């Protein structure tokens, strides 16, 4: 609760000081739109998901629109979007199973899966559209959503993980973890016994390795990912039952069938099939998802940190029609805000964290000042030293506002000056200590720092978790000192430090609150007091 109140207070302060257009008490939402991973083309817009947040690109005026709970969405952390031209509606699903339908008439929420206590695993693996119906592949079966009526039509509880679904004239097919199954559309699909195994005559892969199934040129197509990665690829079944390979590539990520095209891709290469014998290959730098709904020669790509990229085929050449929609000064890099602090009207955010163990989050440092974000590139630390993750705190040098120390729950303390990496402190070059040695663990990954702060003299104080001496200090002369307390010996969650005007250090942990007073003599421990 204290962290929530502290976070809200900091947000209010920064928004009050930097958002001149906002009236007092009016909130703004700052969501990350840094890495675009999902895309869906609609009539006049291209919708995309970046870091779990929805935005759109207007194809007519090139404007960007962002969507959030403030604009009517029911939830956050989006995992799928797909546009259904039959009903002119965007289907949005969230990682917790919640569902929104976005159309010109507004946003309609369907919380069937979210609220269903009988379904514990609410993972949605894929979505297939057939007229006004959307078939949601889940870890327990298939949910059929009528997008025109805005209601759940059916739930097929197959008691197995379903990766993908497709429908032809007479049958519905499902790629599951147990293999490929199918049923007649005229049968009672609610009855598990109506679903039968579908056999493929292929020595290349087993049907349990099919991750996506589709229909192209009236042929069943499969993205198979068998244990033998040399056979990963796109396959299709001819009318006589023969299974043929279309493309083998161990790096294939997805198969998309839209606009009478079969499209598959690796991280940086597109394969666009107009038929089983007519293929274009396009290099596109970064590809996370692709959509093509309106013009069969125009393709929209979810291109990571470049946002939305558009390409068009013209005279047998592919040209870029949209290079980049990202403006990284407008958004935080990630939706992580484990620790925040204000310094001279600048908001500093450490996007890491910890629980019973480390969270494994990339070292995320973000700044917000004068209406703009600066997102520090964690690779500058990773490349100069090693990978540093799980930032837990930030301390700003009182004598230099561009000089920071960032604590990490695993790698020690990172020193940054003028947005450049200066040093990484761990047990090899400081008094910081790794946790008690456990065979097989690299001590460089277990220098666990809970928080950092400066005192008024310019000494940097840090809490060191799961060690004998839980409190460390980097003095102004560049040397270190350590302090141990019986209550905090090997304490798991020694956390933040607050230094009061009388120079006492207040430190919180699961074991309680420690108050430490060094009497202003760091090197003389004879007069120290703690309780």
Describe the role of every protein-language-model region:
Residues 1-26, 461:
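Bacterial Sec-dependent N-terminal signal peptides
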Residues 20-531:
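Carboxylate-rich, polar loop motifs that coordinate divalent cations or form catalytic acidic clusters
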């Amino acid at each position: 609760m204290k962290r929530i109140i502290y976070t809200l207070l900091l947000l209010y302060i920064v928004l009050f000081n930097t958002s001149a257009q906002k009236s007092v008490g009016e909130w703004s939402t700052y969501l990350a739109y840094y890495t675009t991973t999902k895309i869906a083309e609609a009539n006049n817009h291209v919708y995309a998901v970046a870091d779990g947040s929805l935005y759109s690109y207007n194809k007519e005026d090139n404007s960007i629109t962002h969507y959030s709970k403030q604009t009517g969405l029911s939830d956050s952390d989006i995992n799928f979007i797909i546009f259904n031209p039959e009903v002119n509606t965007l289907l949005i699903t969230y990682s917790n199973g919640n569902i929104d339908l976005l159309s010109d008439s507004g946003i309609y929420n369907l919380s069937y899966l979210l609220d269903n206590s009988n379904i514990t695993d609410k993972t949605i693996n894929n979505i297939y559209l057939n007229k006004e119906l959307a078939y949601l592949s889940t870890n327990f079966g298939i949910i059929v959503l009528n997008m025109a009526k805005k209601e759940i039509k059916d739930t097929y509880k197959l008691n197995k993980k379903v990766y993908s679904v497709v429908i032809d004239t007479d049958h519905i097919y499902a790629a599951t973890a147990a293999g490929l199954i199918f049923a007649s559309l005229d049968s009672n699909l609610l009855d598990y016994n109506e679903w039968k195994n579908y056999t493929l005559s292929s020595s290349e892969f087993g049907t349990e390795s099919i991750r996506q199934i589709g229909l192209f040129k009236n042929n069943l197509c499969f993205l198979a990912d068998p244990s033998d990665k040399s056979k990963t690829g796109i396959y299709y079944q001819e009318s006589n039952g023969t299974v043929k390979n279309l493309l083998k590539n161990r790096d294939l990520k997805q198969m998309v069938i839209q606009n009478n095209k079969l499209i598959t891709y690796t991280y940086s290469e597109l394969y666009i099939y107009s038929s089983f014998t007519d293929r274009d290959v396009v290099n596109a730098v970064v590809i996370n998802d692709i959509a093509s709904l309106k013009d069969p020669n125009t393709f929209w790509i979810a291109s990571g940190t470049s946002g939305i990229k558009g390409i068009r085929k013209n005279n047998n050449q592919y040209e870029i029609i949209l290079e980049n929609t990202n403006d990284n000064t407008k958004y935080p890099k990630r939706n992580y805000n484990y620790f925040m602090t204000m310094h001279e009207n600048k908001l500093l955010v450490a996007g890491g964290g910890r629980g019973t163990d480390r969270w494994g989050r990339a070292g995320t440092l973000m700044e917000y000042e004068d209406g703009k974000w600066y997102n520090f590139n964690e690779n500058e630390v990773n490349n100069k030293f090693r990978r540093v993750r799980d930032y837990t705190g930030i301390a700003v040098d009182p004598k230099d506002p561009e000089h920071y120390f960032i604590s990490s729950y695993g790698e020690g303390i990172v020193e940054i000056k003028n947005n450049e990496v200066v040093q990484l402190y761990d047990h090899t070059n400081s008094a910081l200590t790794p946790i008690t040695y456990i065979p097989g663990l690299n001590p460089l990954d277990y220098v666990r720092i809970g928080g950092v702060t400066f005192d008024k003299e310019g000494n940097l104080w840090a809490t060191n978790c799961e060690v004998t001496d839980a409190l460390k200090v980097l003095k102004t002369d560049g040397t270190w000192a350590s302090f141990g307390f019986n209550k905090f010996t090997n304490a798991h969650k020694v956390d933040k430090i607050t230094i009061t005007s009388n120079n006492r250090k207040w430190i919180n942990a699961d074991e309680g609150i420690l108050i430490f007073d060094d009497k202003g003599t760091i090197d003389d421990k004879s007069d120290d007091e703690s309780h």
